[in-house]
Amino acid sequence: MIPSKYKLAPPDDLHPYSESERAKHKIYPDFDPWKHTKEEDEILLNFVSKGYYSTSKVNFESISARSSLQDSLPKLSSTLSEKFSEVVRIREREINTIKGNSKDGMAASKFTDLCGPDFKLPSRLTLTDHRKELWLQELSSPYTPLHKITSFIPHGLKRRQVLEQCYIKQIPLKRAVWLIKCCYSIEWKTGIAKYANSPQEKDKFNAHLLKEWTDNFVHILEKLIFEMTQHYNDSVKLEAWKTEVSYFLKLVGNCYTLELIDKNTFHFWILQFVSKVENFEYLPLPLHILELFWSGICNTNSTKVNESESNPLYMVTKLTDILLNQYYIILHSKSMINDDKYIINDIKKNNSIKESLLASIQKLICILFKQQSLEVFLFPPTSWEKYKPCLIQITSALYRKSDEVAEIKRKLELISYRNETLKYTPPISENKVKDDLILTTFTENSGSITVVELSQVDTGLTGALDDNATDFDWTSYSDQEISTKIQIIQIILWAIHPSRHSHYEAGQLAAKLLLLKINTMDGFPEYEIEDEIWSLVFKLAKLSDKSKALPAVLEALYSLLNTLIVYGLIKVSTYIRKLISSGILYLTESNDKYIHCRLLINLKMSPLMKSQYNMVLKNVMDQDPEYYNNYNFDQIVSIVEDLKVKLPNGDAIEYSNYPMSVKISLGEWYLTYLCNGKLVNETRESLTEKYVLFAHQLNTNHLYFKWIEFIVYHQLIEDIETLEYLMEVLLRYKKLFSQYINDHVLFIKTFIFIIRRILKERDSIAYSLTSFMDFWKFIMKSYSLEIRADTDLRSEMSAVYEEEKAKKEITEGEKDSWMGLYQNIHPDSTSLDQNHTGFSELFLTNLKTFLSSKQDKQAKKKARYNLLLLMQAKNRDYSKFISIYLKRKDFKTSDLVNLLSSKLLTLDQIKNTYGLKYVLELFDIESESNCVFYEYQKRCYIELNYKSVLSEYNVVSHHEMNRFIFKIVNHSTSAKLKETASALLTKNLEANKDKAIQLFYQLVYYQNNLEFLSSEELQEFAVNNSPQKLYSYLDFTNLWLFQSFTKFYIHETFQNTNEDKVKVGDVIFSIIETTKYNVLCAKIFEDIRDHRVTDLVIELFEQDFFKKIISGEEFKAEFLQMLIEIINHLSMHKGKTNDRSGEQSHTSYELCVQVMAHFQQLSDSELSAKEIELDVFMKIFTVHQNSVFQEILRDTESSSAMIESLFALFERVNFSLRLKLMFYEVLSSLKSYCTYEAGISDEQSRTKLMHKLMCLPPFQVSSFFPEEDDTDCTRDPALSLGLDLGTASANSTSSTTPSEGTHKKRCAIWDKRLHKYTGELQRKPYYCIKNYQDTEDINNCSLNLSLFDARYERNNPR
């Protein structure tokens, strides 16, 4: 309803305002009527008549909206994504494009021979609009003879106008086709006269004209389809629209048959249009159009022999991908009408629409499945994961309708194998080679080192955890990358390992990832993760005895387990039950029960578990009564109660004497006490006191962040100084900010409100002198997506930035602009002496006051503001006098720390005065726990100047070596810093070769124990052990260190032995034996950049493996798994640095031929027993595929033997479909390589070779399954995928398998009189034609080109 105009009169009984407010305001309270606009009226009427409905951003209110605000892919993969997107664009632009019909001769005009010699095209005549309309009406009337109106065609009818008039006037189809052909012919005749002497230009014009007409057909068809939704509420218009669409489809069909449309372009448009339809309302009509032109797209009715004349295979592959994608989208959609104006309440109707669309698409996919090559069902891995269940569901319909059940199941199995079992899948055996986790402690005279050995290691996960950028999308990462329980174990071990103790966020990050994984659709159940965690705890307890309990590990473990208990992921009751049932408590000689008791004492305990808790402690009273006497449940409750009295009174408490359970209980109580008490504003001193208590003494960071949220949301911040300290804390623990603060946007908005609306007025002087730019930069970097999505926050952040810039301009401006600040600080002072002496006196006086311990807080605060004003207003003078102050050395170390914490001094100023060495010595002095900004500044400075910092240490000195190692372990927390540290570590190892073992052993020992060994202990270890001994300490936490050491050690061995392969091989195999075939061995060579060393390592492993196969030696499964990973990693690493990634030495090639012959000589049963070795051999073969193919093309005797062996093994390997596919891939790639690679001189030998390869059967079911097994494709368990494909009839049979010779095309002359073929034609194959031009490798990948939708046109070489 639109409000009308009215006047307001003061109410009779309303009391007026007070006299003081009557001057400028109305006497009575009043409000203005709504000043509406035309647009608002339309919106109002629309909502009143139709209602308002807004779709939710997520499916359920309990689901986080983060996924809708942030990008789905992690930012670390953005570069890779861009590269692959560029590849796809290039492929679509250069390869998968319709290039016209000039090559096929279809671009030639269809009107070259129109009719007899007397035939003439109608002439063009200029008519008025009225007469043109009459002419069109006569043409559309079936009662008007055609010969009366065919003498001329009106001007203005061209292309789109002709087509539009045809469906608008409903011109009979025969007349419409005549009009189109005439207009086309007139246009062609006019244009072809320009290019009479240029056949090349004539062909271009023909192709261009045909494409122009095709584009106009497409344009009108698109327009008609999208007009559908405009006529929902008008039945008359809707009926007229149906008539127009029906007519135009018939017209398109006729022109399509008469080849007035470029078929390839039209087919491509149909596929693109079906793929881009997102609104399900439009989908039925595109599907109908697809069915109309199905035979043309799929070539089902083609009788052409020449493959190049048919549609490319990629078009059918694209069609398959589009249909499966649409099927997947519809299957997972809840509503079939995606429009705000519609709400489907009728579930049956919605399901009916959904089933109808699914049935239409299912029918088309089934046709493709039965009629097309299996290659059209090959997809990228990400797409296959989506399409696999859909394809199984679709083909299940064929089981009920078809008798060829076995054939269908075989096709589906072959497609599944082809998509899932690529060449570099993990080998080999289905049996587990090792336990998931093995913890080993190596004890030396100097100490012990615990090594963590995992059956599988995700190095990418370790890198992501180490980096842990504040803006990293862990939600997407956990959903996409974390898929196994061994990764869960790896996350927990990373969080509690001593080498990661500098990651203050480790425990909270691990808990967050476990929580995210549980909440994902394919996540693990809670009880499974809880079982894994407690199993890990039991394994850790076995490592240590009573005297040494790995304190660095256990402290982090206490914190992590308590965090998981808070989130409800684990329960202490479950732990106690497992502990009692294990029987560990009743073993008198068991030392790990003491670890369990200590762990239990440090866990937060519920009163319900009191009896079980006390029972566990009582079981060890005979060996150690201290646990029960000091830490029984009642005693812990009593301790907490005593501390509750002491803490508010400010009594001195030694918190380090109490277990973690006491600290957590006390911290929670104190937080409740603060929040429920009288609310007072927080000052810097009180905030610092609580920071020291929660973060350092109680080790409960999560409680301190809760307190921060409380005081921010309640606006309990006294002044700018307090706010500045709060920002320093948030910067110091910025990686916890994103994890502990629940609503980042609300928190930031409240923060800005406090600064701009409250503290800016309350404490204007401090606001003008204090810079918050570092904090705002952190917010902008970490929460850019949230800021972009929230317009209010974006505008607030812009205003904050402008104010920060304005502050700087005021203090750096003219005298009048900052003199006001000085007058506000010193209201009693009248002027400021601007001469040099005045500045000196002011600087020294305020500096002395600030550093004096006798001055009160207010005087120090004023002195700091004076110094800040001097620093900003006269920066050059301030830097000069601060340098003089430093050079006098009239200060204590604590004074420098105080100046740095107060932002009155920078580390660069100290470095410029005393050098970097002095700065590093200052860092080694432990500061007080409340120096938050100093700790943040120190860490940022080290990371920013990391290379210079590490280069400053001379590792020859034992003390300098320890400081160098300390910096590496504590600050190499990102990939960039690790790369810098790795380069400098290698450099120091090379410069101090005599102390290399000592340096690296000290590094590994400190990383594991956080303690340094003495120089005598290091010397003793270096004398008694070889460098290979160090590799026994390899695990996922120190892999990057061993990569640096391996680079140094292998290069040193390579040079000292004069490149002796035997000696280098002895060293390498000794390293492998020392690690006991650790899965990480494949990655320790990655830092080696010298391709000679890399080639040698690959050659040594290959030749050793080949010789052992020939000699018949048995292999350990761990060795085979490690072998193939080493060769794959090194080969791929070489491919990134040079183009020789696939080269193989001649010796290795000869051994490869011998191995093939060896496998060929084995019987079927022996060959089946060697499946694992054959699998590894074929993977190695594919690594050097191009190199091997080049050897084969030289046509040596060994090459012929190689091909014979490949074909023989391909025929015999029926026990493993994966291996059979691998042989097929190799042969198929060899066939492509030989076909298109030039340079063979002997044509006869080439013909013989190609004749053999041309007999390779096509990719179909009969090529991979023997005929005698057709009746039951699931008989052999090795060929089963574990798919639920339905039950097949035992008597069902498949189609007859064609013989090998039927795949070869033959040509002969057909005698019509005798009705038989006579005189077979001998055609010289195109691949036997000489080509003297050099070409590049066309198949330098391990997979067949058909996987990538690539296709080569069969044209003679130029």
From Swiss-Prot:
The gene is SRB8. The keyword Metal-binding does not apply. It is found in: Nucleus. Keywords: Activator, Nucleus, Repressor, Transcription, Transcription regulation. Disulfide bonds: none annotated. Component of the SRB8-11 complex. The SRB8-11 complex is a regulatory module of the Mediator complex which is itself involved in regulation of basal and activated RNA polymerase II-dependent transcription. The SRB8-11 complex may be involved in the transcriptional repression of a subset of genes regulated by Mediator. It may inhibit the association of the Mediator complex with RNA polymerase II to form the holoenzyme complex. It comes from Candida glabrata (strain ATCC 2001 / BCRC 20586 / JCM 3761 / NBRC 0622 / NRRL Y-65 / CBS 138) (Yeast). GO terms for biological process: negative regulation of transcription by RNA polymerase II; positive regulation of transcription by galactose; positive regulation of transcription by RNA polymerase II. This is Mediator of RNA polymerase II transcription subunit 12. Component of the SRB8-11 complex, which itself associates with the Mediator complex. PANTHER family: MEDIATOR OF RNA POLYMERASE II TRANSCRIPTION SUBUNIT 12. One of its GO terms (molecular function) is transcription coactivator activity. InterPro entries: Mediator_Med12. The keyword S-adenosyl-L-methionine does not apply. Belongs to the Mediator complex subunit 12 family. One of its GO terms (cellular component) is CKM complex.
